Structures are given as structure tokens and as C-alpha cells.
Amino acid sequence: MVIALDCDNVITNTTACVLAQHYADTGEKLTLDDIKGYYIENYVGDDYKDDFHLIFFKKEMWKRVQVLPHCVEVVKRLHDKGNEIYFVTSTEPQNVAKKARFLQRTFPFLDIRKCLITTHCKQMIGVDILIDDYEMNLINGSYFGILMDYPWNANFDDASDDKIYRVFDWLQVEPMIEYIQTLKNSNENKAITSGDIAKNPSVINSSIIPLLLDDKQIGVVRQIENGVMSGEISLGNLSIEMLQLSDSKYEVKAIRIKH
């Protein structure tokens, strides 16, 4: 499959670093949870709005940026399986060269000269899957979308679009891609609901599926073997990992607070 990856907040923790740099420059402290929409400048103080875009040209800000956990190892496995990997970004032209160098250092097994795409209209690219943190880049595309969960896309009802699936970290990306591959192969674009699972566990024919509650995705369910399922449910800022022991009994394996 042909898989395209957004860069900021999909590969790297860019917004977290922007907020850290903004705090260092101004003393105004904001967290990811404060950013309820895609454009950060809408959430800073009025005194900082006009010049906020200049923060993206500061070397000290970009020095803070780190690759998200498990990203490189998952991309490497996807590449080794024969998938074509592309990076697609709306980076300003003057920053493209720096981003290309960063990507080449981070993903030495790829030739960035052949796989970096810059565009403000991602719907124009012809790929099988786009991974992005901005839901508007996924809507109305010819591709399946994987939405990386953040506060600024929390209000997007991904269950309303049968080609967009939400994940919460890179460990969920690879099995979600496998699930989408299953959908493509079977020409089925319908998510399986928790009710479907309860009525007929055999409907699970891939390693991961979305878990829906009242038509809203609250997590994912993974089949381990012999019909045994594990799952992760997101409730607010709590992530609950569970293992099904029987039809009516679940074991809570871990409860994590998402920051």
C-alpha cells in the first residue's frame, strides 16, 4: 500500500514544543489540552497573536522537537513489508530544506528526495492511507484516513466517516493499517460495533478494529487468539486497557492518564 504521513504532531511533538517555546519567550503557559482547534494562535493571549507565526522560524524551537515514541520502528516495519512511504506536509517553503534534512536523519532507510510532498491540499494526493492530526485533511480524500488523537480533533466524530479511524499512539498505527488493508481487500468499509462483537465474536477477522459506543469511537479492540480479545477504551483523559476473560467478565490491565 501507499501510505502518506503528515509530519508535525504525527511524526514529531511539534505543538508541545511550540507551546514550550512560547512559554520561554512570553511566560504564558499553555498545555496541549488548552488547544481546542488546529490553529494555535487562536488560543494565545491577544498581545501575542499577531507575531505568533514567527515562532516557527526560531531555531531554538526546532531544537526542542523530538520524534514521537515508536514512530521510527513502526515506519521501518511498514517499509520493510513493501509499503511505499511518503511524507506530506504544508510546511512553508523556506522551512522545507530543514525539514527534509531532519526526515533523512530520522528515517535513513528512506530516500527523502523521492518521498517528500509539500502541499496545502492533501486531498490531491493519490495514496491508500493518510495519517494526520487535522481531520480536515482526511475528509473527502480518496484515501483511508488515520487520525492521530489530540485535543484539537477530539470533537470530530470519526464514527460518522467510514474511511477515517482514530488512533492514540504509534503502537496502534500498524495494526490499524492491517485492518484497513483487510477492508480494502474485502471492499468492506464498515466498522464493527461492540454490539456486533457481543453477538458474534467471529466477526473479528483482523488484528484490530474500532470500538464504537452510540456511534462514537471510544477505543479499539484487538483479537489475540482463540476468540480472546483485548481492548483500549478512551474516556476523557483516561485510557483503560482491558482483557476479556469471558463473555461478561473483563480484567483491567492498566489505567493511564493521557497528557
PLM regions and their residue ranges:
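Short linear proline/tyrosine/threonine-rich motifs used for host-factor recruitment
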Residues: G231, V252-I255
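Conserved phosphate-coupling serine/threonine residues in phosphotransfer and NTP-handling enzymes
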Residues: T89
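Active-site neighborhood of HAD-like aspartate-dependent phosphohydrolases
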Residues: M1-D50
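Short, acidic loop-to-helix structural element flanking the phosphoryl-transfer center
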Residues: K59-Y86, Q94-A97
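Conserved non-catalytic scaffold segment of RNase H-like nuclease domains
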Residues: G45-W62
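Acidic, low-complexity, intrinsically disordered interaction modules
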Residues: V220, E225-S239, L243
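Conserved active-site motif detector
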Residues: E188, I192-L213, M229-E232, N237
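C-terminal cap/substrate-recognition subdomain and adjoining C-terminal extension
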Residues: E92-S194
